[in-house]
Amino acid sequence: MGSTSSLYAAIDLGSNSFHMLVVREVAGSIQTLTRIKRKVRLAAGLNSENDLSNEAMERGWQCLRLFAERLQDIPPSQIRVVATATLRLAVNAGDFIAKAQEILGCPVQVISGEEEARLIYQGVAHTTGGADQRLVVDISGASTELVTGTGAQTTSLFSLSMGCVTWLERYFADRNLGQENFDAAEKAAREVLRPVADELRYHGWKVCVGASGTVQALQEIMMAQGMDERITLEKLQQLKQRAIHCGRLEELEIDGLTLERALVFPSGLAILIAIFTELNIQCMTLAGGALREGLVYGMLHLAVEQDIRSRTLRNIQRRFMIDIDQAQRVAKVAANFFDQVENEWHLEAISRDLLISACQLHEIGLSVDFKQAPQHAAYLVRNLDLPGFTPAQKKLLATLLLNQTNPVDLSSLHQQNAVPPRVAEQLCRLLRLAIIFASRRRDDLVPEMTLQANHELLTLTLPQGWLTQHPLGKEIIAQENQWQSYVHWPLEVH
């Protein structure tokens, strides 16, 4: 571990869980060293007078004693501890905070709902790829934050008094997962949302990002069940029906839902359905970071980059000493191929971005060894922290790199869920051809080519006489033609 002065810690005393994040700054980004999360369920200790019970406070202090051990290594000026909704509400919050500060040896700041929303947005802006005009949704234990913004700037932010713990106690107190309880929870959530919905819709968004445990749980369920990672209202309604079918909270079993998340899953699901319905959200993806990341980046005073993915790719290229000129050369050829076939194949812009990203990293496996370089590349990409890329996108990149040469493993292309299997196959074909035609590692030796698609048939036209003048190239293309034919990818080269 580096010198202690390079370490930063962010602690979030949430209504459901307490979290600690310890990082160090690396090349304009952060490297995570420690993440500790403990379910404290502080909000469950609030009574009708908003008094926090002694038992709930003791659970919180016990957790902070664990955190305090790690904080001894970090300068106090590089630690931020914030408390959110439950400690905003609790009339005896001062008692809890006084002892918490004594345990941690540093100040604990109770932040407003608006400040919490702003920090969540900053965490998302620093760690999440895609369009920069976004709506961010975070459902915590006792509050829900909704923020619109562009780039680093928020345009509207709201903190609403509803959360997965408070809605659990209010609408699922009998642990019954019947339609009536869901209807009541959703109706109440929609009433809370209605006063702010118009302003949020007025500011608008191109992408919607979820930054909470509920959204994380949904992502895990979808990955476990082989669905794509995009959260839609249809999928939420299907999961609600599955929960209703289970009958009771203690009997809730859904593939991919952990026991730890199950208790507050139905209440969080009801709130999320209300948000989708009231704001007419088409699709949501998981954020790369939220409140804790916002705190850390705030301490580091790092500017928000417009393109998180580009920063990530640059950092990885430097770290693994990838030949950047060659990566760019392959990317240029792949982009040219993509642009020629995108209309026939009905490819989306995100597919182009992911293909170019695969090109930028395709030689990363050489940093381990030439032998089995594609396998090494796939392993590294699957396991590296790649801010800006979702888990499913990381899996797709790893799968493309695994299949960049040699016989194609079709099943691996079908097991990823970032894009439809057919699109993954098409991106793989373009990547393989781009690598072949940039293999001489000189711009002036990349031939002028046209690529046409007719359904699955690819027709590649080279300059006249090129195959005769390049016998090794001709042999490599013949081998590639054979490998593609094994998986029924027709390729004609003229």
From Swiss-Prot:
Taxonomic superkingdom: Bacteria
Catalyzed chemical reaction(s): guanosine 3'-diphosphate 5'-triphosphate + H2O = guanosine 3',5'-bis(diphosphate) + phosphate + H(+)
Record-listed E.C. numbers: 3.6.1.40
Family annotation (InterPro entries): ATPase_NBD, GppA/Ppx_hydrolase, Guo-5TP_3DP_PyrP, Ppx_GppA_C, Ppx_GppA_N, PyroPPase_GppA_Ppx
Claim: Cell membrane is one of the keywords in the record: no
Keyword Hydrolase: yes
Pathway assignment: Purine metabolism; ppGpp biosynthesis; ppGpp from GTP: step 2/2
EC top class, as a word: hydrolase
One example GO MF annotation: guanosine-5'-triphosphate,3'-diphosphate diphosphatase activity
BP terms from Gene Ontology: guanosine pentaphosphate catabolic process; guanosine tetraphosphate biosynthetic process; nucleobase-containing small molecule interconversion
Keyword terms: Hydrolase
NCBIfam families (UniProt xref): PRK11031.1 (NF008260)
Protein family according to the UniProt entry: Belongs to the GppA/Ppx family. GppA subfamily.
Protein function: Catalyzes the conversion of pppGpp to ppGpp. Guanosine pentaphosphate (pppGpp) is a cytoplasmic signaling molecule which together with ppGpp controls the 'stringent response', an adaptive process that allows bacteria to respond to amino acid starvation, resulting in the coordinated regulation of numerous cellular activities.
Protein name: Guanosine-5'-triphosphate,3'-diphosphate pyrophosphatase
Natural source organism: Shigella flexneri serotype 5b (strain 8401)
